[in-house]
């Protein structure tokens, strides 16, 4: 059984593109898949995988046809630690990281939205 939740973030600013988010939760396991993009193509190919370990979060990259950046790894680690689950992520946000404060705020809003999606799906 799985649960699919999709959300579009609109920042109300024509200079900041909308972000499309999809979260898939596999039940009864604790695996979570997260895709996010603010460009015309959806992320595909590689995934960052994080799993909670005994003392830290273990992270690896699952290589596919595309490539991922540090954002995918960062989000995967944050979500894995918070929810004590296996988290697979592929995030494609336009802009330079982490030096662009405007785009960095988009990442912050995206991760908040993903956390909200996961928490609200627990109660339903």
From Swiss-Prot:
Any one GO molecular-function label of the UniProt entry: protein folding chaperone
GO biological-process terms attached to the record: proteasome assembly
InterPro entries listed in its UniProt record: PAC4 (IPR032157)
Compartments where located: Cytoplasm; Nucleus
Gene3D superfamilies per record: 3.30.230.100
Keywords tagged on the record: Cytoplasm, Nucleus
Pfam families tied to this protein: PAC4
Broad class of the protein's primary localization: cytoplasm
Superkingdom: Eukaryota
Glycoprotein recorded as keyword: no
Keyword Cell membrane: no
GO CC list: cytosol; nucleus
Xref: PANTHER family: PROTEASOME ASSEMBLY CHAPERONE 4
Designated name of the protein: Uncharacterized protein C24B10.16c
Species per Swiss-Prot/TrEMBL record: Schizosaccharomyces pombe (strain 972 / ATCC 24843)
């Amino acid at each position: 059984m799985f649960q699919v939740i999709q959300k579009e973030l609109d920042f109300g600013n024509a200079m900041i593109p909308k972000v499309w988010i999809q979260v898939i939760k596999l039940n009864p396991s604790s695996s979570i898949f997260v895709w996010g993009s603010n460009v015309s193509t959806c992320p595909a190919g590689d995934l960052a995988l994080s799993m909670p370990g005994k003392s830290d979060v273990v992270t690896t990259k699952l290589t596919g046809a595309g490539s991922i950046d540090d954002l995918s790894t960062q989000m995967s680690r944050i979500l894995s630690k918070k929810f004590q689950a296996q988290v697979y992520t592929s995030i494609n946000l336009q802009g330079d990281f982490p030096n662009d404060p405007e785009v960095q705020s988009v990442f912050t809003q995206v991760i908040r939205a993903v956390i909200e999606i996961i928490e609200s799906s627990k109660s339903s």
